[in-house]
UniProtKB/Swiss-Prot annotation:
The keyword Cytoplasm does not apply. Residues 454-496 are annotated as: Disordered. This is MLO-like protein 15. It comes from the Eukaryota. It is a multi-pass membrane protein. Belongs to the MLO family. It holds the Pfam family Mlo. Residues 31-59, 169-269, 313-355, 419-496 are cytoplasmic. Residues 1-9, 81-147, 291, 377-397 are extracellular. The lineage of its organism: Eukaryota, Viridiplantae, Streptophyta, Embryophyta, Tracheophyta.
Amino acid sequence: MAGGGTTLEYTPTWVVALVCSVIVSISFAVERLIHRAGKHFKNNDQKQLFGALQKIKEELMLVGFISLLLSVGQSKIAKICISKELSEKFLPCTKPAGAEKSLKDSSHFQFSFTGRHLLAGDAPAGDYCSLKGKVPIMSLSALHELHIFIFVLAVAHIIFCLLTIVFGTMKIKQWKKWEDKVLEKDFDTDQSIKKFTHVQEHEFIRSRFLGVGKADASLGWVQSFMKQFLASVNESDYITMRLGFVTTHCKTNPKFNFHKYLMRALNSDFKKVVGISWYLWVFVVLFLLLNIVAWHVYFWLAFIPLILLLAVGTKLEHIITDLAHEVAEKHIAVEGDLVVRPSDDLFWFQSPRLVLFLIHFILFQNSFEIAYFFFILFQFGWDSCIMDHVKFVIPRLVIGVIIQLLCSYSTLPLYALVTQMGSSFKGAIFNEQTQEHLVGWAKMAKRGVKKGATQVGTSHDATSPRPSIQLNSLLGKGSSQQNQNPKEKSEIAHHD
């Protein structure tokens, strides 16, 4: 085909076989690697991480479908014609003189008919529209570059999420020594009741309570902002919040392994973070729409995840401060140990889950920034007009690195600990085997209720609570302390 290179009919068989074998080998190696990782997670009872791996496979499958649609529909898309005037509006770069003769100097959304042809059929598509006095809505070259960008974005998001969870987990594992110190104590209930704790002398209160009044409240926010950059969580914070959680949800088991629960809860949340949800794809589309020359959208966009991350980190730190203020303002001394009271009221819109949504968006936004930078760098070069001036590029890269480090070592560990201070606990409070038994039992109970198989079953449903609904709530969105009767709490408390 003219200008398109030789077809498969006239390509040496050894070339076809070689290229095919390399592509298949790489694909097979990646598939085996994912399979082995899944097998490892299953053998080690890490079902939350296995779920996250399944989510990654779903994302890769979605990218595969997008790739297939672009490949199959590219010739049809290239034959959609629009007026030349319309094609020159909302460009990411200013069109240089003689752009029709030089594809190299044009942007990836520019439409050219006489430049290089990445795929056979580019010229016919251009000729098809030029005969009508119009231009293709998108050239095959631009479609090919968009294809590459979507793939780079998905891979970058997965890699950055993995790095974040790995570094965050390393930080949380440092807290294990505090958990071990607590578990080594001899828990004597009578002794605990007899002792009194002077609130103002408690280390947690001394480090978090600054006083009462507007000036002290403002200073508390400043302290919370600064603390996320330093020691975001210290030993007194961890031990106090651990005691608050155990006292609220596992009162009969003071030796509940809170650290192990944190790790399970974090792994469970990870599979929600690693995916690219529909609203994130909407964000990508909006960015591609608004990436107009002279607007510098790419530069200003870099500040969104940074501002959100600082706001989330400050809020999480301030929740710890609020817990200290609540005790210090009400008590001079308390009987037994100092205990904080978890509550959803501490969080924005009374929703601890909102924090996970924001972290998800922050990680994706940062991944998008880095992926877009490297895509432009390798596809069009450093001098590309989309890359913009150096004064805009360097700050973006610096901000991206700061976000990645701060989110990994400060915000994510803070999230893992502080969100346990809500009114509800997560299904991760049970180990994986117990969760499976409970879910299975709940499903069986629910089917029994629906069928109404026997009169006894019907009578039981009419006179007693419906455990299936309670357990579904527990293992899905969590279950508040108030919704659990003492017997259920006792059973929960002995699972770590």
